[in-house]
């Protein structure tokens, strides 16, 4: 149809956010990108994502008389926390349980030990990022050259790691990953460990 194209619809949070705050933070992130491009800092985008046995795109080429049947499995899942740079560097951890503040703090503590220059991590306003425990660690990390930059509410498009999660879920994980939990673990691990090599994103 003229003027239309077939594509996946996305949910939008634009109506809920503060436009002025969004534009301010967007400008600050652009400044951080320039500092990174000049070599003054490293810049990472952080987030958590959930992976279960229900495929995000249940479409595949199938024989007409042999449809591909996926088990209706629920319950088991994987959670990934990651820090991604525009250079396709990825620091991540996978858990078979939910993340909480203590686990995120441990993850950030591990990350700060391997940075070698002033580093900024961009995070959303998830409760585990804004908890008293997490906020109490910010000064300690700052003293180790790790700074936290919080996004404005309802602004996922400013967090580039959201693109990574979409690519993994909609493009990179093969459909057979959802046949069983072991397959999911193996396929997800392969993608995560090969990001920046076999899999990449041009920002």
Predicted regions and their residues:
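Short functional hotspots at interaction and active-site rims
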Residues: 1-203
């Amino acid at each position: 149809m003229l003027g239309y194209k077939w594509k996946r619809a996305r949910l939008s949070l634009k109506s809920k956010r503060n436009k002025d705050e969004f534009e301010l933070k967007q400008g600050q992130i652009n400044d951080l990108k320039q500092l990174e491009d000049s070599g003054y800092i490293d810049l990472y985008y952080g987030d958590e994502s959930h992976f279960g046995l229900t495929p995000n795109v249940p479409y595949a080429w199938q024989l007409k008389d042999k449809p591909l049947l996926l088990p209706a499995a629920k319950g088991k899942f994987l959670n990934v926390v990651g820090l991604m740079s525009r250079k396709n560097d990825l620091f991540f951890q996978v858990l078979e349980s939910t993340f909480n503040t203590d686990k995120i703090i441990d993850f950030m503590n591990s990350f700060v030990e391997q940075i070698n220059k002033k580093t900024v991590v961009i995070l959303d306003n998830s409760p585990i990022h804004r908890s008293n425990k997490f906020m109490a660690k910010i000064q300690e990390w700052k003293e180790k050259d790790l700074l936290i930059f919080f996004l404005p509410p309802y602004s996922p498009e400013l967090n580039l790691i959201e693109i990574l999660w979409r690519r993994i879920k909609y493009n990179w994980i093969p459909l057979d990953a959802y046949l069983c939990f072991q397959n999911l673990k193996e396929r997800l691990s392969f993608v995560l460990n090969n990001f920046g090599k076999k899999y990449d994103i041009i920002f």
